[in-house]
Amino acid sequence: MDAIYEVHGLTKRYGRTAALNGVDFAVTPGKLVGLLGPNGSGKTTLMKISAGLLQPTAGSVIIDKVPVGVFTKAVTSYLPDRMALPTEFTADDAVSLYADFFTDFDKVKANAMLADLHIGGRDKIGSMSKGTQEKMQLCLTMSRAARLYLLDEPLGGVDPAARDYILSTILHNYSEDAALMLSTHLIGDIEKVLDEVILLQDGKVLRQAAVDELREETGESVDAYLREVYKC
């Protein structure tokens, strides 16, 4: 099967510091991939370049056979690692904005997910907790019929009780002809839903592997394996 998301020799430098250094990988449709690594390993930089928000120093990102640009923004649904909407917006304002910007946005689905999470349409973003803001942004992101979903730390600010709902939302709201990549530090919570992992360190790919293959090879969970790989 042809890859839907390809990264070739991707490098991003800030002065003498390389946030990414020759990153290569490919992801096929139907895969849910964990992008894993310690702080400063390049996860957010990779996602921002893939979402068209940063320019690389070298290399390329191909999404649905097209280099990152105007077209790929239309087929990529990106969840940033922090609130990207004005704090004076209400949840209804946010839904309307997404409906205006993205032709693949399902307003009915978004409102249903927000209601499930007890987020009212008139609730202002500025009055929401960090966890509620993240849940709202996830609902918006997953209400698009995208080809590629990029979720940067979707579980970072939510309480443990909400994580199962969020994982269920992720699993049930992307199709088999799409791919989804999420970055997280909470591998123990999401390992059960991942198909593959990509391990980053110091801006380089240490490894890309199927989760089942990694478990069989090491005889331990991915969480335990990562603790060994990234131990100080």
Show the residue positions of the predicted features.
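The feature captures the beta-strand-to-loop junction immediately N-terminal to the Walker
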Residues: 36-38
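Helix-to-loop junction immediately C-terminal to a conserved catalytic motif
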Residues: 51
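Conserved ABC transporter NBD signature motif
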Residues: 58-72
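ABC ATPase "signature
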Residues: 208-209
